[in-house]
Each structure stands twice: as C-alpha cells, then as structure tokens.
C-alpha cells in the first residue's frame, strides 16, 4: 500500500484498514505457530509495514487538524 493511497483515505477508513490488517496479521502468525507454512513468507513483514504506514499517516492527519 502506497503512502499516496493512504493519504487519500479518511481517518475512519484508515482505522478500518488497520483493523483488517491486524486481523490478517494475527491469522498469519497463528498459522506460523501451528506449523503451517505460509504461501509467501514476506506476508508478515509486509503487513507490519503497512500497519506502520497507516498509523504514521493517521498521526500526520491528526496533527494537521490541530
């Protein structure tokens, strides 16, 4: 997910996307602990990075509102 795409979203949409990605991350981590290999081992890293991007841009937007 590109930062330019995230900046176009509203804060509510960002919150919803964060929730979705956190659920997906929990599912992937659960599969990993169960011993099931994932199709793509980079999925967990990419999910974590996307969540960090979303949180960073959300904070930027909240600072702008002040």
Swiss-Prot record:
Keywords, ordered alphabetically: Ribonucleoprotein, Ribosomal protein
CC annotations in GO: ribonucleoprotein complex; ribosome
Pfam family, one: Ribosomal_L29
Transmembrane segments: none
Any one biological process term the GO annotation gives: translation
InterPro entries: Ribosomal_uL29 (IPR001854), Ribosomal_uL29_CS (IPR018254), Ribosomal_uL29_sf (IPR036049)
Record-stated family: Belongs to the universal ribosomal protein uL29 family.
Designated name of the protein: Large ribosomal subunit protein uL29
UniProt source species: Thermococcus gammatolerans (strain DSM 15229 / JCM 11827 / EJ3)
């Amino acid at each position: 997910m590109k930062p330019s795409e995230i900046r176009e979203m509203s804060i509510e949409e960002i919150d919803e996307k964060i929730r979705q990605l956190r659920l997906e991350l929990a599912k992937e981590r659960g599969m990993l602990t169960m011993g099931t290999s994932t199709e793509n081992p980079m999925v967990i890293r990419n999910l974590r990075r996307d969540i960090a991007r979303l949180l960073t841009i959300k904070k930027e937007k909240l600072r702008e509102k002040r």
